[in-house]
Protein backbone atom coordinates (compact mmCIF):
# COMPACT_ATOMS: atom_id res chain seq x y z
CA UNK A 1 0.00 0.00 0.00
CA UNK A 2 1.34 3.43 -0.90
CA UNK A 3 1.81 5.84 1.96
CA UNK A 4 1.84 9.58 1.42
CA UNK A 5 5.32 11.04 1.50
CA UNK A 6 6.24 12.44 4.88
CA UNK A 7 7.43 15.99 5.21
CA UNK A 8 10.95 16.73 6.28
CA UNK A 9 11.23 18.66 9.56
CA UNK A 10 12.19 21.78 7.59
CA UNK A 11 9.14 21.45 5.31
CA UNK A 12 6.84 20.89 8.29
CA UNK A 13 8.32 24.01 9.91
CA UNK A 14 7.42 26.03 6.81
CA UNK A 15 3.76 25.02 7.05
CA UNK A 16 3.30 26.55 10.49
CA UNK A 17 1.49 29.92 10.53
CA UNK A 18 3.81 32.91 10.85
CA UNK A 19 3.16 35.61 13.43
CA UNK A 20 4.97 38.96 13.43
CA UNK A 21 5.47 40.43 16.90
CA UNK A 22 6.43 44.12 16.90
CA UNK A 23 7.51 45.90 20.08
CA UNK A 24 10.43 48.20 20.85
CA UNK A 25 10.92 46.52 24.24
CA UNK A 26 13.21 43.47 23.77
CA UNK A 27 11.99 41.74 26.91
CA UNK A 28 8.37 41.83 25.70
CA UNK A 29 9.40 40.50 22.29
CA UNK A 30 11.10 37.54 23.95
CA UNK A 31 8.17 36.94 26.30
CA UNK A 32 5.63 36.98 23.48
CA UNK A 33 7.73 34.55 21.42
CA UNK A 34 7.87 32.19 24.42
CA UNK A 35 4.07 32.45 24.78
CA UNK A 36 3.25 31.96 21.08
CA UNK A 37 5.71 29.33 19.84
CA UNK A 38 4.12 26.48 21.86
CA UNK A 39 0.89 27.14 19.92
CA UNK A 40 2.65 25.78 16.82
CA UNK A 41 3.42 29.20 15.37
CA UNK A 42 6.57 30.53 13.75
CA UNK A 43 7.26 33.82 15.48
CA UNK A 44 9.27 36.60 13.86
CA UNK A 45 10.12 39.45 16.20
CA UNK A 46 10.83 43.06 15.29
CA UNK A 47 12.06 45.86 17.57
CA UNK A 48 11.67 48.40 14.79
CA UNK A 49 8.22 48.86 13.22
CA UNK A 50 9.71 50.16 9.96
CA UNK A 51 11.65 46.90 9.59
CA UNK A 52 8.46 44.96 10.33
CA UNK A 53 6.60 46.82 7.57
CA UNK A 54 9.41 46.13 5.08
CA UNK A 55 9.38 42.43 6.05
CA UNK A 56 5.59 42.40 5.65
CA UNK A 57 5.88 43.91 2.15
CA UNK A 58 8.30 41.13 1.15
CA UNK A 59 6.56 38.26 2.93
CA UNK A 60 5.07 35.54 0.77
CA UNK A 61 2.81 34.35 2.15
CA UNK A 62 1.86 37.19 4.47
CA UNK A 63 1.90 36.48 8.21
CA UNK A 64 -1.27 34.96 9.63
CA UNK A 65 -1.23 37.51 12.45
CA UNK A 66 0.55 40.63 13.66
CA UNK A 67 0.84 41.40 17.37
CA UNK A 68 2.01 44.99 17.76
CA UNK A 69 2.58 47.51 20.50
CA UNK A 70 0.93 50.90 20.13
CA UNK A 71 3.64 53.27 21.40
CA UNK A 72 6.96 52.76 19.62
CA UNK A 73 9.77 55.16 18.79
CA UNK A 74 9.61 55.53 15.01
CA UNK A 75 6.01 54.61 14.20
CA UNK A 76 2.93 53.94 16.29
CA UNK A 77 0.93 50.76 16.05
CA UNK A 78 -1.93 52.41 14.15
CA UNK A 79 0.48 53.54 11.43
CA UNK A 80 1.85 50.00 11.24
CA UNK A 81 -1.69 48.62 10.89
CA UNK A 82 -2.44 51.13 8.13
CA UNK A 83 0.74 50.26 6.19
CA UNK A 84 0.09 46.53 6.41
CA UNK A 85 -3.62 46.68 5.63
CA UNK A 86 -2.96 48.75 2.50
CA UNK A 87 -1.34 45.57 1.16
CA UNK A 88 -3.52 43.02 2.96
CA UNK A 89 -6.89 44.57 3.92
CA UNK A 90 -8.03 41.58 6.00
CA UNK A 91 -4.75 41.25 7.94
CA UNK A 92 -5.44 39.97 11.46
CA UNK A 93 -3.94 42.20 14.15
CA UNK A 94 -3.76 42.31 17.93
CA UNK A 95 -2.75 45.68 19.41
CA UNK A 96 -1.19 45.82 22.87
CA UNK A 97 -0.61 48.97 24.87
CA UNK A 98 0.12 50.24 28.31
CA UNK A 99 -0.44 53.88 27.33
CA UNK A 100 -3.84 53.99 25.59
CA UNK A 101 -7.13 52.16 25.84
CA UNK A 102 -9.22 50.62 23.12
CA UNK A 103 -11.70 53.50 22.94
CA UNK A 104 -9.34 55.38 20.61
CA UNK A 105 -9.66 52.55 18.04
CA UNK A 106 -13.44 52.07 18.10
CA UNK A 107 -14.25 54.42 15.23
CA UNK A 108 -11.05 53.91 13.27
CA UNK A 109 -11.20 52.03 9.97
CA UNK A 110 -7.76 50.68 10.89
CA UNK A 111 -8.81 49.28 14.26
CA UNK A 112 -7.15 46.05 15.36
CA UNK A 113 -9.12 42.82 15.64
CA UNK A 114 -8.35 42.68 19.36
CA UNK A 115 -6.87 45.06 21.90
CA UNK A 116 -4.91 43.91 24.94
CA UNK A 117 -3.98 46.30 27.76
CA UNK A 118 -0.54 45.92 29.34
CA UNK A 119 0.21 44.27 31.63
CA UNK A 120 -1.63 41.18 30.44
CA UNK A 121 -1.64 37.50 31.27
CA UNK A 122 -0.22 35.02 28.76
CA UNK A 123 -3.59 33.23 28.77
CA UNK A 124 -5.29 36.39 27.47
CA UNK A 125 -2.92 36.59 24.52
CA UNK A 126 -3.14 32.88 23.70
CA UNK A 127 -6.96 32.97 23.79
CA UNK A 128 -7.01 35.90 21.35
CA UNK A 129 -4.52 34.21 19.03
CA UNK A 130 -6.44 30.92 19.10
CA UNK A 131 -9.66 32.77 18.32
CA UNK A 132 -8.23 34.74 15.39
CA UNK A 133 -6.30 31.83 13.88
CA UNK A 134 -8.89 29.19 14.76
CA UNK A 135 -6.28 27.02 16.50
Regions found by a protein language model. Give the residues of each.
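Acidic, metal-coordinating helix/loop segments flanking the phosphotransfer/catalytic sites
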Residues: 45-65, 105
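Non-catalytic signal-transmission and effector/linker regions of two-component phosphorelay proteins
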Residues: 1-20, 30-33, 54-57, 61-62, ...
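A Lys-centered signature of the CheY-like receiver
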Residues: 118
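Hydrophobic/aromatic residues positioned on beta-strands within the core alpha/beta folds
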Residues: 95-96
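Active-site residues of response regulator receiver
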Residues: 69
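Receiver (REC) domain active-site loop signature in two-component systems and cognate sites
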Residues: 72
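Two-component/phosphorelay signaling modules centered on CheY-like receiver
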Residues: 26-44, 132
